[in-house]
């Protein structure tokens, strides 16, 4: 059963890595003016909820399967994703708003956040891979 938990977490983490890379590519396209702010934000806002659900699902799964260290490692990122989604002002298009993305260095902060998430998901990927191999060997 433990191996199934880590296989699912590994697959989910792969999806989150690809999503982080997509965020970085789309934000860098906006930074270089290859796409306009409205299309960039609509592309990115489509994937905010799937990212939130995917990461929260793994966090809850680690809590249920009693992997406390991994749960506590994932909890701040899941809480940040939930906080970021809840705190969107009512007039905005979503987490990524085309009217504000160029203001106050928001583009740079979104890019930095995407890079940090990519590093975090890569760390989690190798941690889940190691845990999955260990669980398969122990079974």
Swiss-Prot record:
Pfam families: Cornichon. It is a multi-pass membrane protein. The keyword Lipoprotein does not apply. InterPro entries: Cornichon (IPR003377). One of its GO terms (cellular component) is endoplasmic reticulum membrane. It is found in: Membrane; Endoplasmic reticulum; Endoplasmic reticulum-Golgi intermediate compartment. Keywords: Endoplasmic reticulum, ER-Golgi transport, Membrane, Protein transport, Transmembrane, Transmembrane helix, Transport. One of its GO terms (molecular function) is signaling receptor binding. The chain crosses the membrane at residues 5-25, 57-77, 118-138. GO terms for biological process: endoplasmic reticulum to Golgi vesicle-mediated transport; protein transport. Interacts with Sec23/24 complex components SEC24B and SEC24D. Interacts with CCR5. Interacts with ADRB2 in the early secretory pathway. PANTHER family: CORNICHON-RELATED. Involved in G protein-coupled receptors (GPCRs) trafficking from the endoplasmic reticulum to the cell surface; it promotes the exit of GPCRs from the early secretory pathway, likely through interaction with the COPII machinery. Belongs to the cornichon family. This is Protein cornichon homolog 4. The gene is CNIH4.
């Amino acid at each position: 059963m433990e191996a199934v938990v880590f296989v699912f977490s590994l697959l989910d983490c792969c999806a989150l890595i690809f999503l982080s890379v997509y965020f970085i590519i789309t934000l860098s396209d906006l930074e270089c003016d290859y796409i306009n702010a409205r299309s960039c934000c609509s592309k990115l806002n489509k994937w905010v909820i799937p990212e939130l659900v995917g990461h929260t699902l793994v966090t809850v799964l680690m809590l249920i399967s009693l992997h406390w260290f991994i749960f506590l490692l994932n909890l701040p990122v899941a809480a940040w994703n939930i906080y970021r989604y809840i705190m969107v002002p009512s007039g905005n298009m979503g987490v990524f708003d085309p009217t504000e993305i160029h203001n106050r260095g928001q583009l740079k902060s979104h890019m930095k956040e995407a890079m940090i998430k990519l590093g975090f998901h890569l760390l989690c990927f190798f941690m889940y891979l190691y845990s999955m191999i260990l669980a398969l060997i122990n079974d």
